[in-house]
A protein has these predicted regions:
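Short, low-complexity, polar/charged sequence segments that are solvent-exposed and flexible
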Residues: 188-190, 236, 248-251, 305-310
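Insoluble glucan recognition modules
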Residues: 1-211, 217-224, 277-287
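Short, solvent-exposed loop/turn and secondary-structure capping segments
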Residues: 181-184, 192-194, 228-231, 240-245, ...
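Glycine-rich phosphate/pyrophosphate-binding loop
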Residues: 239-296
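Extended acidic/polar, glycine-enriched regions
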Residues: 204-260
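Short, solvent-exposed loop/turn segments at secondary-structure junctions
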Residues: 15-16, 176, 235, 291-296
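Short clusters of hydrophobic/aromatic residues that line enzyme substrate/ligand-binding pockets
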Residues: 26, 207, 259-260, 270, ...
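Aromatic- and glycine-enriched glycan-recognition loops and surfaces
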Residues: 160, 211-215, 219-222, 270-274, ...
Length: 314
């Protein structure tokens, strides 16, 4: 190999899905030969077969409505095993009564049973687990339940709403236990890979959870020139630093959101340009242009080839 590392991912069919949620890397430690072992749904890479746990396990449990889960196992599920499946709320240390029916040889639909007065409610911010007598337990992932109207937010104000006197931050995160805004005076320190991995040292301000799974915060001061990210904590104990998915300006390589007064960035006569009215958005035709491809030809007549400056030449 030209490198001692090999990046890879495993896909299902024609990219219907991929195993685990991110790319992985194999380390080629000795020579050009390496043997690895992979387990479906397990992000670890095993270099020795004896390290692999091949005992029967549940691969996934997807919460697809307020009462239904799709559970997949690594092996066939016998009819006699259906009554042993359990849904546990690990946050509240509580077990739900459920019923199970087979969808295929290795899939079941697990449904919450109605209680004396009503069906128990699922809180997407809690940590849930599905287990059974013959399969190792798996964590529940909130999937189509988040399409429920209770969590569907159709507002147009997610992200940062900036004014000179105050800034409002909104983040849709229905599975989060806690969310904080973290403010910085600079873009952070970059490592050799162009990433900012140390996000400590910022000013943390707790956000408030509102309807539809939206977290909100208003800061009554001028934040122009600051940088920010969100600190998101979950019921399973994990905490992630995440850039605002609705950020309109970011630092290099998208490591932190940048707080900018966009009115100050407008060129002269910016507001005097009138665009034709958009009568129907579905009639739009969008074109994509690459700066280099557009300008690099020797016959282009452009002096600053491959640069934005070249596109502006007259």
């Amino acid at each position: 190999f030209p490198s001692d590392k090999l990046n890879f991912l495993i896909r299902k069919g024609n990219w219907e899905d991929k195993d685990v949620g991110h790319d992985r890397t194999i380390e080629v430690k000795n020579g050009n030969n390496v043997e690895v072992w992979l387990i479906q749904g397990d992000e670890n890479i095993y270099y020795d077969k004896k390290d692999v746990d091949t005992s029967p396990k549940l691969v996934s449990a997807l919460m697809d409505s307020k009462i239904d889960l799709l559970v997949t196992s690594a092996g066939n599920i016998e009819d006699s095993e259906l009554d042993s499946f359990k849904l546990i709320d690990k946050t509240d240390n509580k077990e739900f009564k459920t019923s199970a029916i087979k969808v295929s040889d290795n899939k079941i639909k697990l449904t919450l049973k109605k209680g004396l007065f009503r069906t128990p409610e699922i809180d997407p911010s809690h940590d849930y687990e599905v287990s059974s007598n013959n399969f190792r337990a798996t964590k529940v992932t909130m999937r189509k339940i988040l399409d429920d109207p209770e969590y569907f937010y159709n507002g147009d104000d997610l992200g940062l709403t900036y004014t000179k006197d105050s800034s409002i931050f909104k983040l849709w995160a229905p599975t989060a236990k806690e969310v904080s805004l973290v403010l910085y005076d600079n873009e952070g320190t970059y490592d050799e890979n162009g990433k900012v991995t140390d996000n400590t040292g910022g000013r943390e301000i707790s956000m408030k959870k509102e309807d539809k799974g939206v977290w909100s915060l208003k800061v009554d001061e001028s934040l122009e020139g600051k940088y920010y990210i969100y600190k998101v904590s979950f019921s399973d104990g994990k905490t992630n630093y995440a850039i605002d998915p609705y950020a309109k300006a970011v630092s290099a390589n998208g490591q932190r959101g940048a707080i900018i007064d966009f009115s100050s960035t407008n060129p002269s006569e910016w507001g005097s340009v009138k665009k034709p009215p958009m009568l129907n958005p579905t009639d739009s035709i969008l074109y994509e242009m690459h700066v280099r491809d557009f300008s690099i030809s020797k016959d282009s007549g452009i002096n600053n080839k491959g640069k934005f400056e070249g596109i502006a030449e007259e």
